[in-house]
Amino acid sequence: MLYIIGLGLGDEKDITLRGLEAVKKSQKVYMEAYTSLLSFGLSADGLSNLEKFYGKPIILADREMVEEKAGDMIDEAIDNDVAFLVVGDPFGATTHSDLVVRAKTLGVKVEVVHNASVMNAVGICGLQLYHYGETVSIPFFTETWRPDSFYEKIKKNRSLGLHTLCLLDIRVKEPTFESLCRGGKKQYEPPRYMSVNTAIEQLLEVEQKHGDSVYGEDTQCVGFARLGSEDQTIVAGTMKQLESVDFGAPLHCLVIVGETHPVEEEMLEFYKYKSGN
């Protein structure tokens, strides 16, 4: 059996009881470590806490391992119980859907244990979940690569009065361009996690490029950091205001606010930007 288990967003205690039972009876436990992170990141202490709480050694699975060697994990699940741990909910990334398809194609039983994810946890700010349009991803810009396909999606959402959840880039164990060119042993860039501030800077750059007045410095947004953890940060304000806020450690995400209901506005007041945020 292959168990794909959502861990939630905070720490090791956010796993569901059903998920914990599945982990404890698994012979091997992998943890996906590139589409999201728990509040402690990838620190050795954090991983040790997970292993103590779950009572199992945990193998960190980076992007290369999951996308290139998933077959080995699936083979192990033919005759054994194998757990694959995912921060948030298992289907927050297409990679995990692919894993299910491959396992079922080979006749391996799959059981999914759901949990909270950023997709529903953003509801804490008071913006109603059914009032969101398509979610977009904001990638890190480079000197030669500045993709902006998210702009048209935000434009469509705003034309319909809908809120837009922006998921911000995470770059963990990414090979350096130089090592890819050389071939042989790969060298990796240090981890990078996009901040709300960087996301807004890039969004405004794209707006300036297109000039369709989809959003601007005065557009209302909500910035989030470390959703689901005890020290989560939530601030509502204009893009210009949020660009100067210190949201602290990752992970961050951003919501561009659409048309609001009075109840939504009342909730947002609790998180309103104050000078000194």
UniProtKB/Swiss-Prot annotation:
Q: Which SUPFAM superfamilies match?
A: Tetrapyrrole methylase (SSF53790)
Which controlled-vocabulary keywords does the entry list? Methyltransferase, S-adenosyl-L-methionine, Transferase
Positions binding S-adenosyl-L-methionine in this chain are 9, 89, 92, 117-118, 168, 227, 252
InterPro entries reported for this sequence: 4pyrrol_Mease (IPR000878), 4pyrrol_Methylase_sf (IPR035996), 4pyrrole_Mease_sub1 (IPR014777), 4pyrrole_Mease_sub2 (IPR014776), Dphthn_synthase (IPR004551)
The pathway that the record names for this protein is:
Protein modification; peptidyl-diphthamide biosynthesis
Q: Name one Pfam family in it.
A: TP_methylase
Q: What's any GO biological process attached to this entry? A: methylation
Q: What enzyme class is recorded for this protein?
A: transferase
Q: Does the keyword Transcription apply?
A: no
Q: Does the keyword Plastid apply?
A: no
Its catalytic activity?
A: 2-[(3S)-amino-3-carboxypropyl]-L-histidyl-[translation elongation factor 2] + 4 S-adenosyl-L-methionine = diphthine methyl ester-[translation elongation factor 2] + 4 S-adenosyl-L-homocysteine + 3 H(+)
Enzyme Commission number: 2.1.1.314
Query: What Gene Ontology molecular-function terms does this entry list?
Result: diphthine methyl ester synthase activity
**What family classification does the UniProt entry report for this protein?**
Belongs to the diphthine synthase family.
> What does the record give as the function of this protein?
S-adenosyl-L-methionine-dependent methyltransferase that catalyzes four methylations of the modified target histidine residue in translation elongation factor 2 (EF-2), to form an intermediate called diphthine methyl ester. The four successive methylation reactions represent the second step of diphthamide biosynthesis.
HAMAP family on file = Diphthine_synth (MF_01084)
Q: What name appears for this protein in its UniProt entry?
A: Probable diphthine methyl ester synthase
